[in-house]
Structures are given as structure tokens and as C-alpha cells.
Amino acid sequence: MGMRDFQRQMQALAEINQVSESITQQSAVATHGNDYAVLEIALQNDVNAVRAFSTRAEKLDYKRDRFLPKWLPFVNEYLDKGAIYQNDYLVYCIVYLFDIADFDRALSLAEKAIEQNQSMPQGWQTTLPNFVADQIYNWTDKTASAGQSVEPYFSQTFKNVATQWKLHEIVTAKWLKLAAALLLRSPQGKVQASGIDDAETLVLAIQLCNRAFQLNQKAGVKNMIERCVMRLNALAKSGDYDQNRLPKVAGLSLEKQQIDFDLVIEKLTARPLQNSEEGNV
């Protein structure tokens, strides 16, 4: 790199770092939005600044108040132009949006980035689809355990996990198991197959558990399936379960069945939760 190029790069970095006012931000995006080499250096400086904080609260404050307002306009500029290349500041914005629990923007950007086959930045031992799936899974597990609604984020991500994204089998299996558990929750958040009167919901839960078992035989779904079968038998005795109308299920199985994921999502989004302590299956 010649002296003139070096000076130009240093000036560009200075301008990118001085984006506290919106007009300066717009100018920086317009001037340097295509200069990925400069943006990459500026990005690494900001990532290092985040890592330098000693407390999680300080890191979150910086991500929310400094990093994201600075870098999201560059992300929007990148997406608007339509060119596709490995873009680390796009991926870091997704990561930090999840960190501050801005799931609407995080998922919106993540879906676009995954369609572009974006990779995680160097040093990350995961893929972007697996990262996003884990983020929403962990949040869902914690939120549902508190008896609170997990929609729309769970269903939005579940459809991608089940039908679109390439994930490790263990990750997909735990998502299928969680979806089955959510189907069996009461409005108060208690997971209890014996409290479900809709045979179709029980059949779907069994199908999800069996698919999870087929992907990972250590998924731990046997008990849930047995409880669902017991409830279906009780409904059949009372005349509330017509085995000829619904797909036949007979407990833990390696037989693959077509799962209506749209119906799963429809039932999940139609059953809001209320605050309560979690029960057992």
C-alpha cells in the first residue's frame, strides 16, 4: 500500500468513526459504503471495543447505543445495492441484535443473510443458521418455562428450522421436541398431555417427537410420546378420537410420516400462554 492509499484509508476510518450525528452517518455511508476493506478495519476496531468492556451490561450498552446505530445504515446500504459477498458487519449486527433482544430486526436480517449463505466471522465455531436456531431455542425454552408467550418468534423460526435451514441433526431434533412440548402446554404454561382434548394436536406432537427420535435417538421423547398415546386412548374410549380421520400413530417409531408444519404453527399461534410455573409432561 502506497502512502497516498494509506492516508486515504486513515481519513476514511476517521470519517466512519465520527458518525454521532445522522447527517454525518449518511455522508459516511454514501462515501465509504462500497469500501469494504476500510469498513472491515473499522468493524474490527468496534468489535474490539466491545470485547474490552469488563461487564456484560457495559457490552450491551455499547452494542445498543453505539455499535448498532453506527453499522445498521451500512447494512441497509449493502442490502439495497443487491451485491452479495461475505459481509461481517451484517453478521455482527445480527449477533448484537440478538444480544440486546431485538428479535424482530435480528430475525429479519438473519433470514436475508442465510439466504445469501453468509458465514459467521472468523473464529466462530458455528454456522449462522445454527447460531440463530440456538438463540431462539434458548429464549423459547426460558420464556415458555415462565409460562409466557413465545410467539411470533418461535413459529417464525420453527418453519425455517423444520423445512429450510441446513442444521445439525441434534439441533433440529431438539427444536421438534420443543415444538411438541409447546403443543401440549395449557394456557397457563403447564406441559400436560392429559389436559389436551384435541386429538389432532396429540397426533402432531407424537409425529414431531418421532421425527426428533429419528434424527437423534437420544432426544428424550419416549415419555412424551407415551403420555400422548395414553391420552389418545382415553379420547378414543370416549368417542373423541377417530383413528380413521387422523394419521395413525402407535408410539415411538422409526417410520417417517409427513408432518403438516403449517398446521403445527397454526395450533401454536392459536394458543397463547399466561404467566405460570412450568409443569411436567
Swiss-Prot record:
To phage P2 protein M. This is Probable terminase, endonuclease subunit. It holds the Pfam family Phage_term_smal. One of its GO terms (molecular function) is DNA binding. Disulfide bonds: none annotated. Keywords: DNA-binding, Endonuclease, Hydrolase, Nuclease, Viral genome packaging, Viral release from host cell. GO terms for biological process: viral capsid assembly.
